[in-house]
Amino acid sequence: MRMKRTYFRLVLVILAVFCACSIGAHAQSGSRPSPSPTPKSEDQEPIRVFTEEVRLPIAATDTYGHYDPTLTSDDVLVLEDGQQQQIKSIQHLPANVLLLLDVGNQLGLKDTNLTRDVAMRVINSLFAGTRIGVMQFAMKPELLQTWTTDKPGIVRVLKTKMISGKSSRLSDAIAAAAEQFKGTPAGTRHIVIVSDGVDTPGGKVTMTNALKQLNSIQASVHILSYTVLARQELETQTKIWRPGDGIQRDGNPGSNPVANGDPTLPPTATRTPTFKIGSIDTDVAMRRKRKEYERATRQSEKQLTEIAEESGGRIFLPTNPNELLAQAESIARDIGSQYVVTYRPTRPLAAAKPGEYRKVEVASRRVGLYLRSRRGYVVPDNQ
């Protein structure tokens, strides 16, 4: 009996000790400091990851302006900010070409049918395998054809979907065009603009921001400008006095000897003076609009020229429709003559300041070889 009592007391002691340990452990765990929360992603400093390679489009032509298929790295000298660069590779790759067609025609000075013919001339002159897209714009841009190599299909789209509009907003169109090049290889991007370059205010994107987007994709821009053609047409429309059709009218038809049966004078003779009918333009508001448009074309011509030359493309200023069509073929040759040259810059891209611009110069090391490239590039802010 005494042993049972002793055994029972021992069990109680063990239970008491166990409970005390459990309470102490719980108290200690409650006094522990809570772990620091993991910083949110937006609080972390973004890591800039750069691919230390520049892809530079260079057009290579012979004396006659034709594509030179024999270009090698020994033929090309590349300078970046005045420092010679070591070329890694030279490739002739299939191009990605977006046609940006101005169909705004408020004053009747741009011919949509002619623009269509120009676009078809460019398309039919491009190398087989070229990826082509088509966008038209007036008050807003409209994508008519996504990327394709089907030339007959694109021609059908041009014949059935191109429609004239009113005023043109080039800045919105340039921004929309830049968006189409996502996922395309750098160095193969081309935009062909057929326009007078006059930008109607009130668009969603300013021209400054549109040009920033254009520079970011580093596309070569080729321009067929309506500016000279439009000004030639304006010369006749802005005159207050316009001559008639050149047909002489009799001032007094009743005195005409032929009409009165007088056989004494020849049929072409008359006893009264004759005159030519003309017209006087009394629409002052329209004349003012035409003058404003003329000034706008001169400003836009300068801007279009800068855009083309900065990107390594060319601007053409035809004086008649036949020139316009012929120059469309020249643009296709320019696109087909372009190579992609790659090099690792001697000054690392990772060391560049955000938005840093680097000047690029190219020179030929071979007689009879002519090279053309963009003037420079903005270091991409890769994240």
Which role fits each region the language model picked out?
Residues 26-383:
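Scaffold/interface architecture of coatomer-like assemblies
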Residues 1-8:
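N-terminal secretory signal peptides that target proteins for export/translocation
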Residues 8-9, 13, 56-57:
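Short amphipathic alpha-helical "recognition" segments used for binding
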Residues 11-22:
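Bacterial N-terminal signal peptides
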